[in-house]
């Protein structure tokens, strides 16, 4: 067995990079239903994808700038306005393409990882 205790920060950084790459796909998928930032964070968390606000909100802005999400301000019950995000038609096309690509890559990696065992 390999002692990795001294390299744990490296593994944490690699895992963080891997998650960051998947977040675009996850956010687009979750925004099929209108979501505001915190509800999206909670929804992703329930599915095992933790994301902090410092990552989520810039990602939402970037996806909106790219035309993959739309947003609108809405007044919630007796509270401050919330910005709700929803996938756009262009975002739906991107999600379909990314989903196919994810499945292809996942199969390839499964084959590689199974080969190691």
Region locations from a protein language model:
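Beta-hairpin "wing" of winged helix-turn-helix
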Residues: 66-79, 86
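Short, structured secondary-structure boundary patches
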Residues: 18, 73-78, 92-95
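Alpha-helical DNA-recognition elements
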Residues: 62
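Amphipathic alpha-helical dimerization/coiled-coil segments
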Residues: 93-117
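Short, intrinsically disordered or compositionally biased N-terminal tails of bacterial proteins
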Residues: 1-14
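N-terminal helix-turn-helix DNA-binding core of bacterial DNA-binding proteins
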Residues: 15-57, 74
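Basic, amphipathic "hinge/linker" alpha-helix immediately C-terminal to the N-terminal HTH DNA-binding motif
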Residues: 81-99
């Amino acid at each position: 067995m390999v002692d990795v205790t001294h390299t744990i920060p490296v593994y944490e950084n690699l895992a963080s990079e891997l998650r960051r790459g998947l977040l675009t796909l996850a956010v687009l998928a979750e925004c099929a239903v209108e979501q505001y930032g915190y509800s999206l964070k909670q929804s992703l968390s329930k599915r095992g994808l933790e994301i902090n606000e410092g990552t989520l909100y810039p990602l939402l802005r970037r996806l909106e700038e790219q035309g993959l999400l739309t947003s609108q301000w809405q007044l919630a019950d007796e509270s401050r306005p919330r910005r709700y995000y929803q996938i756009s038609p262009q975002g739906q096309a991107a999600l379909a393409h990314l989903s196919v690509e994810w499945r292809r890559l996942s199969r390839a990696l499964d084959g590689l990882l199974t080969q190691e065992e």
